Regions:
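Short glycine-rich donor-binding/catalytic loop of glycosyltransferases
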Residues: 127-132
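N-terminal glycine-rich phosphate-binding loop for ADP-containing cofactors
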Residues: 4-9, 18-19, 71-86, 92, ...
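Conserved CoA-thioester-binding segment of acyl-CoA-metabolizing enzymes
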Residues: 1-56, 78, 83, 89-92
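Short, active-site-adjacent cap segments at secondary-structure transitions
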Residues: 58-62, 110-111, 435-436
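Gly/Ser-rich catalytic serine loop of serine hydrolases
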Residues: 103-113
C-alpha cells in the first residue's frame, strides 16, 4: 500500500495525500518510491484537470531525513549526487505535467517541504500561527538542495531569495505571501482543498497555468539576472559582506550565494545540476556534520527533556518573584511577563523597581510601534509586573529568583529574609554566574528547593539558561527550573555545581588567554582579529570590556573571601590586569568610562592607547595559528574537564551551552564536537605542542586519550 493516497474525483482532479510512516512526511527512501510511482501514474492519466498535493499529517512536509545525511562522507559523493538528482528529476516531472499542480499547505512547509511546494504551480496555505514557511537549511550547515535555491531565485529574485536562504528564515503565511513565497491564503483547514479545486477549475483553459514561470517562453528571473545593473552592484559587495559575517567558516553559505548567482543566468536544469554538485561538497564536509549533530539532534534532545528528571509532573510557574531590578532582574521580569507569568519585581527603592518595569514597557512599545504586538496586549503584559519594595508582596510565589550582585553575604541575607514568602511548594533560584549553589543553599531553610538559574545578558535576546543543581537540589526543584526555562521560551542545559559552573568557568579561559597574549606583548588588534577569524563573535578584549573588568574585580574579591582563589588555574594574569587597568588607570570597562577600548560619542570605539604603552612589544613573535589555537583550545580543554569531572552531564549540554552561552563558533558544533571533528590523535598532538610551548594549561584531558584508545566519539 502506498503512503501517498491517490484519489481522482469526477471533475478530473487528483488529490495526492501524503501520509508517510512516522509522525511527519519526510524526504526519505519511502518518499522517493512513493513520489516516483505517483508521477508515473499522473503522466498516464486521461482526462486530468489538475493535481493537489496535500498532507494527512499536522505538518505539510518536514524536509530531508537528516539521519540519512549526518553520516555522509566523501566516499558517498557519487551516491548522494545521483540520489539528489533522482529526487529533482521527479519534481521536474511533476511541474512539467500538462495540468497545473497545487500545494495545499496545511502545516509547516520547511526545507524540503517548501522545495516540494516550489515544484507546484500554486501554493495555498492555511493562515494559522502553526504554519511556518521557509528554508532553514543554512542554520544546519547545509543549503536547500532540492531545487530551493534555483526555483526561489527565479520566483522572487536573487536578493530576496538569498535574504531568506542565508537567513534560514521561517515565515508566517502572511509574511510568506507578502514576499511571494506562496500565492494564496485560506483562513481554515476546511477551506484548503476546496480553494485548491476552485483555482484548478478556474484556470483549466489557461495554458500557462500548467507552466512554471521558468519554463515559459521568454521567462526572465524576477528582478533580472545577476548581470543587470542593480544586481551587479549587489554581486560586487554581497560576497564580501557574507565573508565578514561568516569569516569564511560556513562553506554552505558561500555555496548558496554562488548557486543563486549562477541560477539567475542559467536555464533551470543546468542550475539544478550545479546545485546538486555543490550540495555533495557541503554535505560530505565536517561543518555540515558538526552543525546537524548539534543544532538538530542534540538541540532536539535537550528540548525534548533529556536533562529533565523523569517521572516528575510538569510544574509551570504561576507567580514569580524577582529580587533585584537591575539589568538582569528587569530582563527576567520581561521574559516572564511575555510568557504570561505574574511577576513581583522587588528592589531596595520603589524608583529602582519601577525603572525595572519601565524596561519592559519600553520593549513592548518598540514591538507595538513595529506592528508586532497589539497595544491592548502590550498593556496586559506590562500589568503582569508589580514593582515593589515590600517582601510581603512575594507571598504565594511558587518561584523566586534573586538577581543581585555577586556577593555571597548579600545573597544569603536576601535568601533568609524572603524565602518564607514562597508558597508551600515554592522553589528558590539564584541567578549567580559564578558562586557555588551548594554553598549558597546553606543559607536556605530548604536547600533541596534551592537551585541555580543562570540567565545570560541581554536576557530578552540570549536563548540559553544554565540550570545548576546543588548537592541537595531535589529532582522536583530541577524539574521546576527546567519547566520554567521552557515556559519562557529558553533552551535549558543542566549542569552540576562547581565554581563558575560550566559557562562562566569556560568563558573565563577565553578572557584569560586573551589577557595573557596581551601581557606577552602581542598587538591587541591582532588578538582581536585572530579571535574573530576562529569564529568567535567578538575578541576577548572587547568582550571583557562588555562584561566589565570591574565585575571581574568584584568576583575576584568574593572568591578571595571564600578562600577559593586560583581554584581553576593561575589567576596571576587577572590580578595584574585588575591592578594595571582599574587600580592604576581607572579602566573598568565599557560602562565604567572605558577599558581596553575607548568609546566615542559617535558610537565608534578604538583600542585605548595606554595598552600599547603597558604591554605591546613589537619584538614578540607569536604565530597566528598559535594565537588562534590558544584562544580556542583553552575553552575546549576547560569544557572537556567539565565533562570529565561530571560538571557537564551530557555532551549535548556541553555543545549547546558552549554555542548559546559562550559563543563557540557555529561551524564547530560546539566545544566537544570540535574534538570529534578535529580528530582525537590530532587533538592530542596539538595539545602536546601548545603545552610544551605555553604551559600546562594546555595539557590534554585524560578523557580524550581514553576516547582515542576506544575509538568512541563524544555523543
Amino acid at each position: 500500500m502506498s503512503v501517498f493516497n491517490y484519489q481522482k474525483d469526477q471533475q478530473g482532479i487528483v488529490t495526492i495525500t501524503m501520509d508517510m510512516t512516522g509522525p511527519v512526511n519526510a524526504m526519505n527512501a519511502e518518499y522517493k518510491v512513493a513520489m516516483h510511482d505517483a508521477v508515473n501514474r499522473l503522466e498516464q492519466e486521461q482526462g486530468l484537470v489538475g493535481v493537489i498535493l496535500a498532507s494527512a499529517k499536522r505538518v505539510f512536509f518536514a524536509g530531508a531525513d537528516l539521519k540519512d545525511l549526518v553520516g555522509a562522507t566523501p566516499d558517498h559523493a557519487e551516491d548522494i549526487y545521483r540520489d539528489t538528482q533522482r529526487i529533482k528529476h521527479d519534481m521536474r516531472r511533476l511541474e512539467k505535467l500538462p495540468v497545473p499542480v497545487v500545494a495545499a499547505i496545511n502545516g509547516a512547509a520547511l526545507g524540503g517541504g517548501y522545495e516540494l511546494s516550489l515544484a507546484c504551480n500554486r501554493r495555498i496555505a492555511v493562515n494559522h500561527r502553526a504554519v511556518k514557511i521557509g528554508l532553514p537549511e543554512c542554520s544546519l550547515g547545509l543549503f536547500p538542495a532540492g531545487g530551493g535555491i534555483v526555483r526561489l531565485t527565479h520566483l522572487i529574485g536573487v536578493q530576496a531569495a538569498l535574504d531568506i536562504i542565508l537567513g534560514s528564515k521561517q515565515m508566517t503565511p502572511e509574511k510568506a505571501l507578502a514576499v511571494g513565497m506562496i500565492d494564496q491564503l485560506v483562513e481554515t483547514l476546511d477551506d484548503l482543498i476546496p480553494a485548491a479545486k476552485r483555482w484548478l477549475i478556474d484556470v483549466e483553459s489557461q495554458a500557462d497555468a500548467a507552466r512554471q514561470p521558468w519554463d515559459r517562453k521568454g521567462h526572465k528571473v524576477a528582478g533580472g539576472g545577476i548581470n543587470t545593473p542593480k544586481n551587479a552592484q549587489y554581486a560586487a559587495v554581497a560576497p564580501t559582506m557574507l565573508h565578514q559575517k561568516t569569516r569564511g567558516l560556513l562553506p554552505n553559505a558561500t555555496a548558496a550565494m554562488d548557486i543563486a548567482f549562477q541560477a539567475s543566468m542559467l536555464d533551470v536544469d543546468t542550475a539544478l545540476r550545479i546545485e546538486s554538485r555543490e550540495f555533495v561538497k557541503v554535505v560530505t564536509g565536517a561543518v555540515a556534520k558538526n552543525m546537524i549533530t548539534t543544532f538538530f539532534f542534540q538541540l532536539n534532545q535537550i528540548n525534548a527533556g533529556a536533562s529533565r528528571p523523569q517521572g516528575v509532573a510538569k510544574n509551570p510557574t504561576r507567580k514569580l518573584g524577582v529580587l533585584g531590578a537591575g539589568m538582569m532582574g528587569q530582563g527576567i521580569a520581561y521574559v516572564a511577563a511575555m510568557a504570561g507569568i505574574q511577576v513581583v519585581l522587588k528592589d531596595m527603592t520603589l524608583a529602582a523597581a519601577e525603572k525595572g518595569k519601565a524596561y519592559t514597557i519600553a520593549l513592548l512599545a518598540k514591538q507595538t510601534s513595529r506592528g508586532r504586538l497589539d497595544a491592548a496586549k502590550a498593556e496586559v503584559i506590562a500589568d503582569l509586573i508589580k514593582p515593589t519594595i515590600c517582601d510581603t508582596d512575594l507571598a504565594g510565589c511558587d518561584l523566586i529568583i534573586e538577581a543581585v550582585f555577586e556577593n555571597i553575604a548579600l545573597k544569603n541575607t536576601i535568601t533568609q529574609s524572603t524565602e518564607q514568602y514562597l508558597s508551600d511548594d515554592g522553589h528558590w533560584g539564584s541567578n549567580t554566574s559564578t558562586l557555588p549553589i551548594t554553598q549558597l543553599a546553606e543559607a536556605s531553610a530548604k536547600p533541596e528547593n534551592f537551585i541555580g538559574i543562570h540567565f545570560f545578558s541581554p536576557v530578552d535576546k540570549m536563548p540559553l539558561i544554565e540550570i545548576i543543581a546543588g548537592e541537595k537540589t531535589s529532582d522536583a526543584t530541577l524539574a521546576k527550573a527546567f519547566d520554567f526555562a521552557q515556559q519562557i521560551g529558553k533552551t535549558p542545559i543542566v549542569v552540576n555545581d562547581s565554581l563558575g559552573f560550566f559557562t562562566s568557568r569556560t568563558f573565563s579561559t577565553y578572557l584569560d588567554e586573551g589577557a595573557k597574549l596581551l601581557v606577552e606583548g602581542v598587538h591587541p588588534v591582532k588578538i582581536e582579529n585572530l579571535a574573530k577569524a576562529t569564529g568567535m563573535a567578538v575578541g576577548p578584549l572587547q568582550v571583557q570590556d562588555e562584561t566589565s573588568l570591574e565585575l571581574s574585580r568584584k568576583v575576584s574579591e568574593t572568591w578571595a573571601a571564600m578562600g577559593i582563589v586560583d581554584k581553576w588555574g593561575d589567576g596571576e594574569t587577572q590580578r595584574r590586569m585588575i591592578k594595571d587597568m582599574i587600580t592604576d588607570n581607572g579602566r573598568g570597562g565599557r560602562h565604567h568610562g572605558g577599558g581596553y577600548y575607548d568609546y566615542h560619542a559617535d558610537g565608534s570605539k578604538s583600542i585605548w592607547p595606554g595598552l600599547f604603552e603597558l604591554y605591546y612589544d613589537d619584538s614578540v613573535e607569536v604565530v597566528d595559528r598559535d594565537i588562534q589555537d590558544r584562544l580556542m583550545f583553552r575553552q575546549v580543554i576547560e569544557t572537556l574537564k567539565c565533562y570529565q569531572t561530571g560538571v557537564l552531564r551530557s555532551v549535548a549540554d556541553g555543545n549547546i551551552g558552549s554555542i548559546m552561552g559562550i559563543g563557540a563558533p557555529a561551524h564547530t558544533g560546539g566545544f566537544i564536537q570540535f574534538v570529534n571533528s578535529y580528530g582525537f590523535s590530532a587533538f592530542i598532538q596539538r595539545c602536546d605542542e601548545l603545552s610544551a610551548a605555553y604551559g600546562a594549561r594546555f595539557n590534554c584531558p585524560e578523557i580524550v586519550k581514553q576516547r582515542a584508545a576506544s575509538g568512541e566519539l563524544f555523543a
